């Protein structure tokens, strides 16, 4: 029952705002500037792999193009009021947090974090995939995510 409530709350929160367009085409190689956890500029295109801490600053809008992978040891910080818009193209747009990677998303009721797509229809972006080390019922105790092929599961 809790799962259904949290799923419904997440979907409701995601659908509050609609996507908007930006003419800013800054590219992000994944490490957010110098790779020391600095804030990424407003309007930056998120893509690639991050290997150290990165912060998406409060109130900024970012575009997601393709995969954005958080590797082991890195943390993706998403502050309140951030909007992430998946680019409308033929590439699967998603955020993948691999085992040992972290995501710290802190929205508020007044300033929610919004993740949406330029194409306003269900299934237009791949979502967030968090691959932990919890027990699973997969054969051998581990599985592989459908998007990104990352390993999940274990005995933790």
PLM feature spans:
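Bacterial N-terminal signal peptides that target proteins for export
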Residues: 1-7
